[in-house]
Amino acid sequence: MNCEREQLRGNQEAAAAPDTMAQPYASAQFAPPQNGIPAEYTAPHPHPAPEYTGQTTVPDHTLNLYPPTQTHSEQSADTSAQTVSGTATQTDDAAPTDGQPQTQPSENTESKSQPKRLHVSNIPFRFRDPDLRQMFGQFGKILDVEIIFNERGSKGFGFVTFENSADADRAREKLHGTVVEGRKIEVNNATARVMTNKKTVNPYTNGWKLNPVVGAVYSPDFYAGTVLLCQANQEGSSMYSGPSSLVYTSAMPGFPYPAATAAAAYRGAHLRGRGRTVYNTFRAAAPPPPIPAYGGVVYQDGFYGADIYGGYAAYRYAQPTPATAAAYSDSYGRVYAADPYHHTLAPAPTYGVGAMNAFAPLTDAKTRSHADDVGLVLSSLQASIYRGGYNRFAPY
């Protein structure tokens, strides 16, 4: 019996040995960190630490598990705050969107209530405004109907203006492409045409009446820049008595002075109706004195300086007194003197380059020599005037 008791004691002591082996595990105060978060950053537990050292694993687990639950609660609180703020902002944003549908219908109603114009093309040519009004009047109130016409009749298109744009759109959808009297009409929205103001171009040269093209016809001497040979007095004229002489004047191109009208009147004497602009009434008065300083002819009326042209001899034989001539002259310089058939005036038969070289008799020998010296220049000038003034309607 004693032996059995000793064995039992030995077994009990041997069984008590593991109690001593459990002490090293009690020194561990913290469990390994979870979710990769170091242990020193974890929030301290608000409860005091337990006084007993046994069974420390349970408070250790509670100590380690509590901070994640606290962070989760904080995150959930943050997310809840975010969701609340998000819903608040969404509601704030949704407020104007709720108000937009209220303004859009008003804008649509305003746009639909405005008048609208339609362009109707390819309509029958016999259509008139009442026909077009009857065709479109079934869709709504029409303010205006207009069909475009020219001198030959309808141009086949027009415009219809509706009081309400919705009626205009409905009429356009219904009538576009329909066939009326064999013609497929087209109805479209009329667009406003942009009207641009064209800049007016001054057609005059140097500020006076003749442009370069017309000036080359009516005053070739001004554009050629040649030398004019003019007789200073009318040989044998009772209206003017003075020394017989020739005056040399240079025609300046583009000379904007009364010389332009003087040259036009100068040629108007032999052309009978061309170029005579202002000085028609000078036939009834004495000619003005010579003005050799100006680039043109000496006399402002071509009648008194026309001996330079031989073609004027056809008119001189029937020329009456100056007062009678003024009474029978019209605004174009035509003289209805003795011949009753002068209303069908044609160019004189002797009018030509060769006949134009025939001068009136000059008494002064010095004047004759001067005329011989410049004969070539005068011939070229007469030829240019003849081609430019007389044959201005010829094709070549």
Curated annotation (Swiss-Prot):
Function: RNA-binding protein that regulates alternative splicing events by binding to 5'-UGCAUGU-3' elements. Prevents binding of U2AF2 to the 3'-splice site. Regulates alternative splicing of tissue-specific exons and of differentially spliced exons during erythropoiesis.
Tissue expression summary: Detected in brain (at protein level). Detected in heart, brain, neurons, skeletal muscle and embryo.
Coiled-coil portions: none
GO biological process, one term: regulation of skeletal muscle cell differentiation
Residue(s) carrying Omega-N-methylarginine: R387
Residues annotated with Asymmetric dimethylarginine modification: R316
Subunit structure: Binds to the C-terminus of ATXN2.
Bias kind Low complexity: ranges: 87-98
A GO molecular-function annotation: RNA binding
GO cellular component, one term: nucleoplasm
UniProt xrefs under PANTHER family: ATAXIN 2-BINDING PROTEIN 1-RELATED, RNA BINDING PROTEIN FOX-1 HOMOLOG 1
Subcellular location: Nucleus; Cytoplasm
Record PROSITE patterns: RRM
Positions marked as site (Interaction with RNA): R117, F125, R126, N150, K155, F159, R183, R193
Protein name in UniProt: RNA binding protein fox-1 homolog 1
Residues annotated as domain RRM: 116-192
Keyword annotations of the record: Cytoplasm, Methylation, mRNA processing, mRNA splicing, Nucleus, RNA-binding
Top-level lineage group: Eukaryota
Location of the region described as Disordered in the Swiss-Prot/TrEMBL record: 1-119
Compositional bias per record (Polar residues), positions renumbered to this chain: 67-86, 99-112
